[in-house]
A protein has these predicted regions:
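An N-terminal assembly and electron-transfer interface module characteristic of large anaerobic redox
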Residues: 1-175
């Protein structure tokens, strides 16, 4: 299936996701990914999401972030005027883009909808990481900060005037 996927679609990366069943049967997804990663010209990245094990739906956010960090993000070469923003379905994209452009002279890098593999490979070069929800972005924010020094903005929820102003100040302080 993986070889067929590559031949048919020529993706820039292939994520091999596990399931409850593969977790129970003990399939060697890592071994398959390692073998095919050596064979194909694109990264083949295992994503472990055996739902029976955790029973916590939000762990899927951390699992996807881990896969991106391990298989796609590259060490920084130079800083870019982008701010990583993880939100649901790129909600409020025009408004966030306008605010980031006008207030911070930076572009938002929305995660993950519509982001390319090339864009994701540069997350370590961006000015900061922000999120609309700690549950959604804590793993990514902490990992980028600890591994590459990209500040993770931790503020109160940006709802309401006080929350929104605190969020903007947190971004400003970080960059």
């Amino acid at each position: 299936i993986i070889l067929h996927t590559y031949e048919a679609y020529k993706p820039d990366a292939i994520f091999v996701s596990t399931s409850c069943v593969s977790g129970v049967t003990g399939e060697d997804v890592d071994g398959v990914a390692i073998d095919l990663d050596a064979e194909l010209p694109v990264p083949v990245i295992p994503v472990h999401c055996e739902g029976f094990k955790s029973r916590i739906w939000a762990s899927g956010f951390d699992i996807s972030d881990h896969a991106i960090l391990q298989g796609i993000v590259k060490p920084p070469k130079e800083k870019r005027r982008f701010i990583n923003i993880k939100n649901f379905y790129e909600s409020a994209r025009p408004q966030i883009t306008k605010i980031f452009n006008e207030v911070f002279d930076a572009e938002p890098q929305f995660l993950y909808c519509n982001a390319t593999i090339e864009e994701l490979s540069h997350l370590s070069e961006n000015l900061a990481t922000v999120c609309i929800c700690g549950t959604l972005g804590t793993y990514l924010g902490n990992a980028l900060e600890e591994t590459y020094g990209v500040p993770y903005v931790r503020t109160i929820n940006h709802s309401g005037v006080t929350g929104f102003e605190t969020w903007l100040r947190g971004i400003g302080d970080a960059i």
